[in-house]
Amino acid sequence: MTTITITRPDDWHIHLRDGAQLKDTVRDISRYMGRAIVMPNLVPPAIDTETALTYYDRIKAQVPAGSQFEPLMVLYLTDKTSPDEIRKAKASGKIVAAKLYPAGATTNSDSGVTDLKNIYPALEAMQEVGMLFLVHGEVTDSSIDIFDRERVFIENILSKIVADFPELKIVLEHITTKDAVDFVTQASDNVAATITAHHLLYNRNHMLAGGIRPHFYCLPILKRNTHQQALLAAAASGSKKFFLGTDSAPHAKDKKEAACGCAGSYTAHAAIELYAEAFESVNALDKLEAFASFNGPDFYNLPRNADTITLVKKSWDVPATYPLGDTNVVPIRAGEAIDWQVE
């Protein structure tokens, strides 16, 4: 039987939600992830240090006994985020980054940034204190085709931020295009990217051909196969600029299977197993550990995890749903098999 032992991985982008759902999301992600960058797009969002730290406490209260899982918190940037708030967040020791949501770009982004110039003072403070800048890289102009919004964001917005803040560490999150791969590859060492398992395993045909499959609908949206192949090549390249970020984003079954369904795919139930499938598909299992366990902490200037996990090449069937608070979530690969499992 094929087995792989790797340093315990981390998830550098996840949505844990809040309230009754928190118990279930934390249960799933803490099974073998050491740490996770927790997105702040709650209702209301974590726009200040106090809100982010009380959210940290709620997450920690749900970590199962015996797990060493540690949430890494993120500040939600708004037009009014002050340099003093950035310094206060950094001094907390638990908030490691601040997140740009262009207003209206994704779930619970209505409080986001309307004009980048509004956050330039905050970005200057982040550059000064060494706080990372996380970016949802899509424009929100309704005249821009949804499949082009990442590329246009990179061309019109991100390139300028990188030029204006050369010492700021920037993570372009959940990249979905060859354009993003090329930009990150060619940028300075201060620019990196996360890649999801579902963008490595699937493209827009899986979502749209032969019927609409709403559980593949996420933002940024799945792109064509050529972009999927570029993502696989980047993840398996050995480059230190790319690392694991699931963007696991649960929504209740009825919120996905609806006339106007929510954006987000749930992968926390089997994150590293799905990544193993993706890396195996391009004969690059030897590159999985760096992508999942080394590149993220190295970029964040945090220690790598000291312990290991073992993956076994053994098929198992994913349940049709998992509990999510007082409802259920349909996970990626629901009712189908996954080729790997954690021993």
Curated annotation (Swiss-Prot):
Keywords: Hydrolase, Metal-binding, Pyrimidine biosynthesis, Zinc
EC number, as in UniProt: 3.5.2.3
Catalyzed reactions per annotation: (S)-dihydroorotate + H2O = N-carbamoyl-L-aspartate + H(+)
InterPro entries reported for this sequence: Amidohydro-rel, DHOdimr, Dihydroorotase_CS, Metal_Hydrolase
Pathway(s) per entry: Pyrimidine metabolism; UMP biosynthesis via de novo pathway; (S)-dihydroorotate from bicarbonate: step 3/3
Residues annotated with N6-carboxylysine modification: K99
PROSITE patterns: DIHYDROOROTASE_1, DIHYDROOROTASE_2
Cofactor note: Binds 2 Zn(2+) ions per subunit.
Cofactor: Zn(2+)
Family statement drawn from the similarity comment of this UniProt entry: Belongs to the metallo-dependent hydrolases superfamily. DHOase family. Class II DHOase subfamily.
Subunit and interaction comment: Homodimer.
Protein name: Dihydroorotase
